[in-house]
């Protein structure tokens, strides 16, 4: 074997090592930015339609302004057409949520935009269109590589309740429910709250409104939503599990 062959083999080995380290680093980063759920509470036994009917009743009594800001639900046929158009299959519980109400109307009224404090219920077609447009803009090779490492895990996420700055409540059709396919994120401190089912998420919201953890502030015009974080935190522990130690 001559000198140049040895150099070529050395370069090839170096490339393989660098690529392997790159894949390892990407996997490690993804597990950090998108962890598997810790042990979660049991799935709520109540059927989703009953949970949503109860939530509707609670909103009518405790937060009528929030209920007034929601759009009418979609038919099963409407949802099927959108699934076909955007080539996605929604989980059954998510379909049920959009048959209940198709998100919140866009409004300058604070409560009119928000379904829960600081989070808007995104209409289905808007959510699917935003997901379809994601990543279609021009980007350099370096920008695309950085995205794959730091945010590529979001490719399969769909935002149900959005805070408008890339955090909120999501579902991931590519994850199993036992892995935490429904979850809340707060990127600033890498907090996740995982739910074993969308039923747990909606039941938790119903309880937050029922017990005053979510409420409409008395007095301000336009009305604003408020959150009792201590009370809400205890409620969420009944329905989901955080990746952060308490």
What is the predicted role of each segment?
Residues 1-15:
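N-terminal Sec-pathway targeting helices
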Residues 11-29:
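N-terminal type II signal-anchor transmembrane helix
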Residues 28-165, 216, 239-246:
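A surface-exposed partner-binding patch
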Residues 167-174:
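Short, surface-exposed beta-strand/loop micro-motifs that present aromatic residues
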Residues 178-186:
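Intrinsically disordered, low-complexity regulatory segments enriched in Ser/Thr/Pro
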Residues 191-212:
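Compact, glycine/acidic-enriched structural inserts
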Residues 210, 217-223, 233:
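Mixed-charge (acidic/basic) macromolecular-recognition segments
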Residues 223-246:
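Low-complexity, Gly/Ser/Thr/Pro-rich intrinsically disordered linker/tail segments
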């Amino acid at each position: 074997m001559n000198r140049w062959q040895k150099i070529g083999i050395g370069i090839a080995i170096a490339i393989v090592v660098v690529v392997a380290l790159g894949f390892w680093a990407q996997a490690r980063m993804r597990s950090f930015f998108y962890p598997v759920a810790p042990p979660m509470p049991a799935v709520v036994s109540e059927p989703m339609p009953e949970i949503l009917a109860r939530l509707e009743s609670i909103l009518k009594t405790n937060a009528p302004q929030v209920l007034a800001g929601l759009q009418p639900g979609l038919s099963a046929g409407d949802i099927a057409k959108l699934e076909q158009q955007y080539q996605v299959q929604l989980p059954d519980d998510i379909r049920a949520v959009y048959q209940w109400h198709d998100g919140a109307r866009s409004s300058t009224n604070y409560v009119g935009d928000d379904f829960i404090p600081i989070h808007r219920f995104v209409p289905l077609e808007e959510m699917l269109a935003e997901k379809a447009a994601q990543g279609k803009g021009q980007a350099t090779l370096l920008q695309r590589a950085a995205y794959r490492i730091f945010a590529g895990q979001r490719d399969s996420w769909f935002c149900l309740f959005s805070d408008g700055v890339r955090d909120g409540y999501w579902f991931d059709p590519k994850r199993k429910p036992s892995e935490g396919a429904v979850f809340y994120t707060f990127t600033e401190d890498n907090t996740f709250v995982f739910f074993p089912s969308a039923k747990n998420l909606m039941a938790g919201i119903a309880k937050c409104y029922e017990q005053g953890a979510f409420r409409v502030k008395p007095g301000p015009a336009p009305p604003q939503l408020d959150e009792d974080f201590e009370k809400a935190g205890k409620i969420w522990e009944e329905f989901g599990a955080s990746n952060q130690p308490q």
